């Protein structure tokens, strides 16, 4: 049966880029990858209320650069930049190299898949109905320019004993199209009944690796298939019939009147009864 591949990994080097951009040899790769995982887990816990969409980690020569995309950059920076300095010192101690932290603002948080998933998870933890939270998020995303959105929740929805899945979709979400810009996000809501998982797919249009929209050839009117003649009832007819040549049976002579239609005479009811009675008498 078909499975849903991760949309970001499916489009790497086509219309998406890596979230960790560095190179390491075989001896240092595992150590640096473990550092990245620790940094992401720390930022997720530290900046839980800052609406962080994604984190990009780059490692130039003997230092590191971390870019945090957030819809609330003021919460990350703090009053007079105090929080950002504390964050920078903690990351430097964790990674062992000087760290530069950049903050990028997300202009439309309603169309960011990760922020939508986190928002729905927070609402579910506050005992808000999952259908209401999902439909409200879909309406806000479509209103602000998304061409399609799909949201799926799975777990003990509304506290039922048997876990199930429910999903809603609005617009187009072409997951098989590589040039489609699909933003994917995942979140978890820790409720009293258990963990509920939220997956969000947002379709923002088509784009290529350089950020440009692809050029789609539109067929001209001459290239389109012409339709056949129409019937009297208004429906298009199929293959046009060729006229019969002269001299063949069924072909009318030129200039002659149309042949009269044969009509079989119907016997009266009395004659039929008389014939039946005569047959019985003969027997």
Curated annotation (Swiss-Prot):
Instruction: Name the InterPro entries for this protein.
Output: KH_dom, KH_dom-like_a/b, KH_dom_type_2, KH_sf_prok-type, Ribosomal_S3_C_sf, Ribosomal_uS3_bac-typ, Ribosomal_uS3_C, Ribosomal_uS3_CS
Task: Please provide one cellular component term from the Gene Ontology annotations of this protein.
Answer: cytosolic small ribosomal subunit
Q: Gene3D superfamilies per the record?
A: 3.30.300.20, Ribosomal protein S3, C-terminal domain
Q: Which residues form the KH type-2 domain?
A: 39-107
SUPFAM superfamilies in UniProt = Prokaryotic type KH domain (KH-domain type II), Ribosomal protein S3 C-terminal domain
Output compositional bias ranges, type Low complexity.
237-260
Alphabetically ordered keywords of this record? Ribonucleoprotein, Ribosomal protein, RNA-binding, rRNA-binding
Is DNA-binding given among the entry's keywords?
no
Region (Disordered) spans which residues? 219-283
Question: Molecular function (GO) terms listed?
Answer: mRNA binding; rRNA binding; structural constituent of ribosome
Q: Which Pfam family, just one, is annotated for this protein?
A: KH_2
Q: Which cysteines are joined by disulfide bonds?
A: none
Q: Where is the composition biased (Basic and acidic residues)?
A: 221-236
A GO biological process held by the record: translation
Family from the record: Belongs to the universal ribosomal protein uS3 family.
Alphabetical list of NCBIfam families matching this protein: rpsC_bact (TIGR01009)
Tell me the subunit arrangement: Part of the 30S ribosomal subunit. Forms a tight complex with proteins S10 and S14.
Q: What is this protein called?
A: Small ribosomal subunit protein uS3
């Amino acid at each position: 049966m078909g499975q849903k591949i991760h949309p970001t990994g499916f489009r790497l080097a086509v219309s998406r880029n890596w979230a960790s951009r560095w190179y390491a040899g075989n001896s240092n790769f595992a150590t640096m990858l473990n550092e990245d995982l620790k940094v992401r887990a720390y930022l997720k816990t530290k900046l839980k209320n800052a609406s962080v969409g994604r984190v990009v980690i780059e490692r130039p020569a003997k230092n590191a650069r971390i870019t945090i995309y957030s819809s609330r950059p003021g919460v990350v920076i703090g009053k007079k930049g105090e929080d950002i300095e504390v964050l920078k010192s903690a990351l430097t101690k964790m990674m062992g190299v000087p760290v530069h932290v950049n903050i990028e603002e997300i202009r439309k948080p309603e169309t960011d898949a990760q922020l939508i998933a986190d928002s729905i998870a927070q609402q579910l933890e506050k005992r808000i109905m999952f259908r209401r939270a999902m439909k409200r998020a879909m309406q806000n995303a479509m209103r602000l320019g998304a061409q399609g959105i799909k949201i799926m929740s799975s777990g003990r929805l509304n506290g039922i004993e048997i876990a199930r899945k429910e999903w809603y979709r609005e617009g187009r979400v072409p997951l098989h199209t590589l040039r489609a810009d699909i933003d994917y996000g995942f979140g978890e809501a820790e409720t009293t009944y258990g963990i509920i998982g939220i997956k969000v797919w947002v379709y923002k249009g088509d784009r290529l690796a350089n950020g440009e929209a692809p050029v789609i050839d539109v067929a001209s009117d001459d290239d389109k298939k012409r339709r056949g003649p129409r019937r009297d009832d208004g429906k298009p007819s199929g293959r046009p019939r060729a006229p019969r040549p002269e001299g063949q049976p069924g072909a009318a002579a030129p200039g002659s009147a149309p042949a009269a239609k044969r009509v079989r005479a119907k016997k009266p009811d009395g004659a039929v009864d008389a014939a039946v009675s005569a047959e019985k008498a003969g027997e």
